[in-house]
């Protein structure tokens, strides 16, 4: 806040005494030149790092006793755009991101022309990926893959197994037949997707349900006849892609204009095109009956359900509701057998006051800013760092249904039928939520250390739901964690992570060099079920 007192240390004051020639009479004039920029504050959503959402919600306040002229943002060096501020200096808006690298500069200008700037760098896309048992990472736009390869899903252009004498990618292997300009990758089960720097989508691996989106012809035979594609090739009909979502046998692609394209299995209506027919080519998700839908900024997919987040903070879902996936306060049982599938998007009311309000009304309002989906459960993160969950909870992936709770009066139900606020995150800085299979994770910043003399840490992962641990003899045991637990105490400073079905890969934020400039690349860490080389370590072969 800019103070108006003359003693303010940063104020530039020029005093000019003008004495008249008339005896002892004199006039004293003091000119105060305002050289102090306004105070600009933003919430934690405006921060550097990887983004799971194709927009950033920018909320904050600008203060200056001399008045505010404007608040603007500049995206990737383009012309400045204005943000609307109310009479108290509050602003709240969303900025759509480009695929890949983004630099956003906020500038608050007061009536004296002083400017306060805040610049953040964000990356829209995933540079690490994990599927059923295959894994990959991008380095300088090139694809490195490893792990299970029975459908050619790593990108080798051939199939292989761990017992082959040569050629199986048990360590990170450069896939020379992949495009050299990739920005984002997404895997699930035994298929793979990628986007290049022009927004073109590529696919390879298992195609038994048409989940590669490349039509019916020219398939290869891997496990069965005509069930895969070994070549990494483009999907026709989709331009300007910015995000991928990989379900178990279907996929979603979000484009720059907010459209969603879907392909693959559709028996539960998970393609959202008002049918229950599989499609091997992209079909557009039908929002024509979705009243009040905003610009879609995120897509996620589960086993047979699909979800979207719009720029109003509204959540939409379609497909299977067998485990209360759509959060409609009812589970599928004999009374409600879910024969009638939901094949078009429906609104999921996550927060009680979740309405399509105006920008001004949203300044103090809690809204959803990020989604994650596991096999049959969903997590939603808000701008207030709250996390909501619903759906399948048999493994305590929502919470309190694991060892010590399950089958007791204190246990949560095995199906959470409506979005429920999870009780563990008050006062925490939740940067990301993750889910796959029957497990959940959050990425926390500013985590206090046990030792009061040690500074707080960023990039700490907490897990709950199904979690496996391996002892010194190589034996792995699984337990269902009731609540978020820091099981990975050696991991810190993580800036992105991807969950496979039962294994994970995380990227460490690059450390600074002596000159303060970050190294270009951080370390990669893998853990979980090691099968066919999925962890990228040749000494692990279970």
Residue ranges with predicted function:
Residues 46-54:
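Short, solvent-exposed loop/linker segments at the N-terminal edge
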Residues 10, 23-39, 43-44, 121-542:
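Eukaryote-biased RCC1-like beta-propeller repeat architecture
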Residues 18-21:
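C-terminal motif of bacterial Sec signal peptides marking the signal peptidase cleavage site
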Residues 111-117:
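Short, exposed coil/turn segments at beta-strand boundaries within extracellular/luminal domains
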Residues 94-101:
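Surface-exposed, short loops/turns at beta-strand junctions within beta-sandwich domains
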Residues 63-70:
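Extracellular acidic loop/turn motifs
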Residues 58-62:
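Aromatic/hydrophobic beta-strand junction motif of beta-rich domains
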């Amino acid at each position: 806040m800019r103070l108006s007192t003359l003693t303010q240390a940063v104020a530039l004051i020029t005093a000019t005494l003008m004495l008249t020639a008339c005896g002892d009479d004199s006039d004293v004039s003091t000119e105060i030149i305002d050289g102090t920029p306004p105070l600009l504050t933003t919430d934690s959503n405006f921060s550097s790092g990887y983004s799971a959402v194709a927009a950033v919600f920018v909320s904050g306040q600008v203060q200056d006793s001399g008045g505010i002229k404007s608040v603007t943002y500049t995206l990737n060096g383009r012309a400045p755009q204005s943000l609307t501020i109310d009479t108290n200096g509050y602003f709240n808006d969303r900025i759509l991101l480009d695929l890949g690298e983004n630099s956003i500069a906020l500038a608050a200008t007061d009536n004296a022309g002083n400017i306060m700037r805040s610049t953040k760098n964000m990356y829209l896309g995933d540079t690490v990926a994990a599927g059923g048992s295959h894994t990959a990472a991008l380095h300088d736009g090139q694809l490195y893959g490893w792990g299970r390869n029975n459908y050619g899903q790593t990108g080798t252009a051939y199939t292989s197994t761990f017992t082959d004498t040569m050629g199986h990618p048990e360590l990170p292997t450069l896939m020379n037949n992949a495009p050299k300009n990739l920005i984002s990758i997404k895997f699930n089960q035994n298929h793979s997707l990628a986007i290049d720097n022009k927004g073109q989508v590529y696919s390879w691996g298992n195609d038994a349900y048409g989940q590669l989106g490349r039509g019916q012809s020219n398939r290869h035979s891997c496990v069965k006849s005509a069930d895969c594609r070994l070549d990494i090739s483009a999907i026709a009909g989709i331009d300007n892609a910015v995000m991928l979502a990989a379900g178990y046998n279907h996929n979603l692609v979000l484009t720059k204009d907010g459209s969603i394209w879907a392909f693959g299995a559709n028996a539960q209506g998970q393609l959202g095109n008002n049918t229950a027919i599989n499609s091997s080519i992209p079909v557009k998700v039908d929002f024509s009956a979705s009243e009040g839908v905003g610009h879609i900024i995120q897509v996620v997919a589960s086993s047979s359900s699909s979800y979207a987040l719009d720029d109003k903070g509204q959540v939409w879902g379609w497909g299977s509701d067998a485990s209360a996936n759509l959060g409609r306060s009812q589970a599928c049982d004999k009374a409600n057998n879910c024969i009638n599938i939901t094949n078009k998007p429906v609104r999921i009311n996550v927060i009680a006051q979740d309405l399509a309000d105006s920008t001004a009304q949203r300044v103090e309002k809690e809204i959803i800013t990020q989604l994650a989906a596991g096999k049959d459960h969903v997590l939603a993160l808000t701008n207030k760092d709250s996390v909501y969950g619903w759906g399948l909870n048999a493994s305590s992936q929502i919470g309190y249904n694991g060892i010590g709770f399950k089958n007791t009066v204190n246990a949560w139900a095995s199906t959470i039928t409506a979005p429920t606020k999870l009780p563990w995150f008050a006062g925490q800085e939740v940067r990301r939520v993750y889910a796959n299979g029957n497990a959940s994770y959050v990425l926390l910043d500013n985590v206090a250390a046990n030792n009061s003399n040690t500074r707080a840490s960023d990039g700490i992962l907490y897990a709950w739901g199904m979690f496996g641990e391996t002892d010194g003899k190589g034996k792995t045991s699984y337990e269902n964690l009731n609540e978020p637990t820091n099981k990975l105490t050696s991991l810190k400073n993580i800036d992105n992570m991807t969950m496979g079905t039962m294994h994970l890969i995380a990227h460490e934020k690059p450390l600074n060099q002596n000159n303060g400039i970050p190294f270009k690349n951080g370390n990669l860490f893998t853990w979980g079920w090691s099968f066919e080389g999925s962890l990228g370590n040749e000494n692990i072969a279970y």
